[in-house]
């Protein structure tokens, strides 16, 4: 994000684009057992929408607190000591704090860090609802481009499947006809077929994992955080005989609710690489910007009541130094 035209960012993007175009060209020109019009009718639209979504992920970007001037920290030391506080819309809606109850601050970007925001060392900038940094995009997946990233994975899986079926059919026909006794195999076609196998298997697995994450309303970072805190909690329960468990506070209660929260509420939004309708409706507000997130009503009432009290106290009491350790995007619930 800090230098989108650098060599390290251009190389993976050019490589990905060339692989798409090369595989499409070989499929359209080297396959003779399937009508050319049928190949073009299926391959070209799938290729076009996959590449469009690929560059949509890059152009849209994940979003950063730096995009919001009111999240800039003017005095880092004052913010760490509690003398400077984030905007009220963040302080009243923020659910993940440091261990000492203070708001999270990025010492590199000098910004307040909303819920689910993390600093990416590759991009060297804070990312809203950061999921992961993808080297094939040379870009992070975050709040603003997560929907398009999921759609790109689905389009790529479909494209790889079509190429795999067509090339395998052509090679199978060539082998069954005994043509291998008279001519060499088409190595371009064989290379595309092998690449399609590798891409289809790997991207299909990652697509399934990503869709599962969407249905759980969890990011990859939060999954790893949950694992770490779950191990710590098991040690705590064994040591003190407690019976506590971890809960993802951003889980809206059902897979469909979580899916619609990210992908939109209609089939049109799910299939087409367009902005969600709720994002367009809230374009001139702070909603749907990755600055705060919806949670289940029962969880929201419980957490926000304590958060409002903490916010009032932080604005009145004498400040103390702030610890740097972050509290995970989870809630420890007493099961008794």
Swiss-Prot record:
Palmitoyltransferase specific for VAC8. Palmitoylates VAC8 at one or more of its N-terminal cysteine residues, which is required for its proper membrane localization. Residues 30-37, 169-188 are vacuolar. Autopalmitoylated. This is Palmitoyltransferase PFA3. Its main location: membrane. GO terms for molecular function: palmitoyltransferase activity; protein-cysteine S-palmitoyltransferase activity. Its EC number is 2.3.1.225. Residues 104-154 form the DHHC domain. GO terms for cellular component: endoplasmic reticulum; fungal-type vacuole; fungal-type vacuole membrane; Golgi apparatus; vacuolar membrane. Residues 1-6, 59-147, 210-336 are cytoplasmic. GO terms for biological process: protein palmitoylation; protein targeting to membrane; vacuole fusion, non-autophagic. Belongs to the DHHC palmitoyltransferase family. PFA3 subfamily. InterPro entries: Palmitoyltrfase_DHHC, PFA4/ZDH16/20/ERF2-like.
């Amino acid at each position: 994000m800090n230098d989108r035209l650098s060599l390290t960012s251009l190389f993976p993007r050019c490589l990905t684009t060339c692989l798409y175009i090369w595989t499409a060209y070989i499929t359209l020109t080297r396959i003779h057992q399937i009508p050319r019009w049928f190949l073009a009718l299926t391959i070209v639209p799938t290729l076009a929408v996959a590449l469009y979504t690929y560059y949509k992920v890059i152009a849209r970007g994940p979003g950063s607190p730096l995009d919001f001037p009111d999240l800039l920290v003017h005095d880092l030391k004052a913010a760490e000591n509690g003398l400077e506080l984030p905007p009220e819309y963040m302080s009243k809606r923020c659910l993940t704090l440091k261990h000492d109850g203070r708001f999270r601050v990025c010492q590199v970007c000098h910004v307040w860090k909303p819920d689910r925001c993390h600093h990416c060392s590759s991009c060297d900038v804070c990312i809203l609802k950061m999921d992961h940094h993808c080297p094939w995009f040379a870009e992070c997946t975050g709040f603003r481009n997560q929907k398009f990233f999921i759609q790109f994975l689905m389009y790529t899986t479909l494209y790889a499947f079509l190429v795999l079926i067509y090339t395998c059919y052509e090679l199978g026909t060539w082998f069954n006809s005994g043509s291998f006794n008279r001519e060499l195999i088409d190595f371009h076609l064989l290379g595309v077929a092998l690449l399609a196998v590798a891409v289809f298997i790997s991207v299909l697995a990652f697509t399934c994992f990503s869709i599962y994450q969407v249905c759980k309303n969890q990011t990859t970072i939060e999954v790893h955080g949950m694992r770490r805190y779950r191990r710590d909690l098991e040690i705590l329960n064994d040591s003190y005989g407690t019976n506590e468990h971890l809960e993802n506070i951003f889980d809206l209660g059902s897979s469909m609710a979580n899916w619609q929260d990210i992908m939109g509420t209609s089939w049109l939004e799910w299939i087409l690489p367009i902005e969600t309708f709720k994002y367009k409706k809230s374009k001139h507000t702070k909603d749907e910007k990755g600055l705060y997130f919806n949670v289940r009503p029962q969880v929201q009432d419980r957490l926000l009541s304590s958060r409002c009290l903490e916010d009032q106290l932080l604005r009145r009491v004498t400040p103390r130094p702030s610890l740097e350790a972050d509290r995970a995007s989870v809630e420890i619930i007493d099961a008794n």
